Amino acid sequence: TGDSAQYYGCITEMDEQVGRLQAKLKKLGIYDNTLQVFCSDNGPEGNDPDFGDRQAGVTGGFRGRKSSCYEGGVRVPALAVWPGQIKAGSVVNSAVCTYDYMPTIAEIMVYQMPDQRILDGENILPVIRGEADRTKSIPFRHKGRAWLVKGSYKMIINSITETKSDEIYDLSRDAYETENINAISPEL
């Protein structure tokens, strides 16, 4: 009922539309030569004054929701399908970012950016294929906070506008961000 019904209705509609797209690609004979990528919006709404009392959506137990710097607000599912290029059923546990899409597509198309333009992201096709790890850090800034993901570590910089201490989490051991290791590992 209410927000939950709308939320799950949107998921059902999205599934139907993805099915229509795939059927059309197959009908046109270009399904096997088309990279399809799907990524959801960041975090479900709720527990934030900007969104009222709406609570639809789940974080899978991750801390935080939309507008939060914690994994429940920024970790989202992404799916990539490209027959013959990406192994079906493979799982990638490396963090990537939507601004990685542009350099990845440019690489696939063998396209050189004009004027040696530098892009923030990186080509993530080797990451998706399981051939390499991400090389660049992922920086974010939102609502007076900043955070940086490098490898399995995530640093949340609260000191920009707050007096709270900064936080560091090892997401490979603590994806739910329950143990701030900043005090015990300040060298990170």
Model-derived segments and their meaning:
Residues 35-37, 79, 169:
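Hydrophobic/aromatic beta-strand patches that form the interior of the parallel beta-sheet core
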Residues 179-186:
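Active-site-proximal N-terminal segment of extracellular/periplasmic enzymes that hydrolyze or transfer
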Residues 2-13:
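The substrate-binding groove and active-site-proximal loops of carbohydrate-active enzymes
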Residues 26-30, 113-114, 187:
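Structural helix-adjacent loops and short alpha-helical linkers that scaffold large soluble proteins
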Residues 23, 27, 33, 73, ...:
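Secreted, luminal/periplasmic, and some membrane-associated catalytic domains
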Residues 44-69, 85-90, 94, 98-172, ...:
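C-terminal cap/loop subdomain of S1 sulfatases and analogous C-terminal strand-loop tails that border
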Residues 33-35, 55, 75, 164-165:
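Conserved catalytic motifs of the protein kinase core domain
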Residues 13-50:
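Metal-dependent active-site segment of extracytoplasmic phospho-/sulfohydrolases and closely related
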